[in-house]
Amino acid sequence: MKRKYTIYGMMALVVLAFSSCQLGKHYARPELNLPQQLDSTEQDTLSIADRQWWELYTDTTLQALIERTLEYNKDMKIAAARVKELAAMKRIDFANLFPQVSGKLYADKEAENYGGDNYDSDRSYEAKAIVSWEVDLWGNLRWAKDKSMADFLGSIEAQRALKMSLVAEVAQAYFELVALDNELAIVRQTLNARKEGVRLAKLRFEGGLTSETSYQQAQVELARTATLVPDLERKISIKENDIAFLAGDYPQKIARSVLPEEVKLPESLPVGLPSTLLERRPDVRQ
């Protein structure tokens, strides 16, 4: 009887040891008792984030610039390489769950020379097949597979977040560059008007119609406007270099379109549900 209790006790200890070696449990999304419809969801649940970037930016020049950036940007290449690396690790961890088969082939040749034409050689061949299988007793291999899958999916989301960031940065820099072009064009028009004003002020001064003060004031306005041109040209050059850097190029001129003076914007943009916006956050998805 005592021996029977001892066996039961040992079995309980074994079960306890197995349960204590469990690494963790799979995550299950909790079920929430929420109402079918909220008062705040009467608006359209469609978000502007559901649209592709080429649907938002219809400028063909900008589209080509974004495509080149996504293809040649150095950070984007690193992210793509990281995805490939983790995809390979995922396949390796998945393969570790199954038996491993390997083979080896040996070839050997022995030769003996007894002098003269007395020559003897012996060749031998040997082949070996090795089968190994690690029993996943504690779940280490399964959890390693799950971890590699999570890392792989996280790298995809990181690449997606980088893509969205690059698209936004290129589009913003592009529109800022076009705005600087328009500003420079206005300044140059103003500069031409100032030059004409100085010419007329000089004629009036020489004709005795105005004092020298008016003529000098026109010259001051001309000089002040002229200083704006090199400053805007410098800003344009810096912005072009920024865009070229994002595209993985050396500093160069950036082609751009001329935007119309009147741009029609939608009266409202669909923002979607707050919960949907939260799920789109790159850090949450990753």
Regions found by a protein language model. Give the residues of each.
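Small/polar-residue-enriched beta-strand and adjacent coil segments characteristic
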Residues: L23-H26, Q52, T58-R68, Y72, ...
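A generic local structural motif
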Residues: M89-K90, G116, V229, K264
